[in-house]
């Protein structure tokens, strides 16, 4: 019933509003998000903010992903991340650094992600596996902060639905939306923004702009 109600929100045109679902008995207070657009240059210098997407194409080394399958078909999908020292140096009094996902806590009271003792932060990490007939078929994943689920879904659909082999699905140009508030501080949103790799054909880009 809930899914049927939510499906009515889907149309040919993207809404520029943030419209989270409301499940009876699980209503939560939503924080106020900045929808003036993403831009974390000054925050990146401090080691916070979205860690992966740069218009300059520069990388500084953070999240990685690895998949391993042995001869018996056992699979491991892992996305190590969360401890890059530029986001939190070692705290002398404690002897360890804070996980970079601590950015996803809120200091405002009464929110689902309000900082509290014993609470775990949410995470963008999504190492994944696909099953076929109940058996492991594919281990996959990617770095990418908030883009991980988006890029992985595109990759999987290109392979399973589009008929691409794994290398073709990886190499094909990708895209993602910045419509929703980012997980990393300062948690800005860019309503209606779609980011495409420059390798897309100009005709496709023009059609999307229209």
Locations of the language-model features?
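M16 family metallopeptidases and their MPP-like homologs
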Residues: 125-128, 134-149, 172, 188
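Mature, solvent-exposed C-terminal subdomains and processed small-chain segments of exported/organellar
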Residues: 1, 74, 163-167, 171-210
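Active-site rim segments in enzyme catalytic domains, especially the processed small/beta chain
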Residues: 45-46, 50, 69-138, 162, ...
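Hydrophobic alpha-helical scaffolding
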Residues: 55, 59-62, 115, 119, ...
């Amino acid at each position: 019933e809930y899914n049927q109600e939510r499906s009515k929100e889907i149309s040919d045109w993207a809404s520029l509003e943030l419209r989270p679902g409301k499940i009876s008995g699980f209503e939560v207070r939503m924080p106020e998000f900045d929808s003036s657009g993403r831009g974390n240059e000054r925050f990146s210098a401090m080691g916070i903010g979205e860690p992966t997407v740069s218009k300059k194409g520069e990388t500084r080394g953070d999240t990685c992903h690895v998949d391993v399958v042995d001869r018996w078909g056992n699979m491991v999908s892992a996305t190590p991340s969360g401890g890059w020292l530029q986001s939190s140096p070692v705290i002398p009094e404690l002897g360890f650094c804070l996980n970079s996902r601590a950015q996803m806590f809120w200091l405002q009271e009464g929110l689902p992600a309000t900082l509290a003792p014993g609470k775990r932060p949410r995470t963008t990490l999504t190492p994944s596996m696909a099953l076929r007939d109940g058996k492991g078929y594919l281990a996959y994943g990617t770095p990418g902060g908030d883009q991980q689920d988006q890029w992985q879904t595109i990759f999987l659909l290109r392979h399973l639905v589009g008929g691409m082999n794994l290398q073709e699905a990886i190499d094909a140009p990708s895209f993602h939306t910045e419509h929703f508030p980012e997980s990393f501080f300062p948690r800005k949103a860019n309503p209606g923004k779609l980011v495409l790799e420059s390798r897309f054909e100009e005709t496709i880009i023009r059609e999307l702009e229209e």
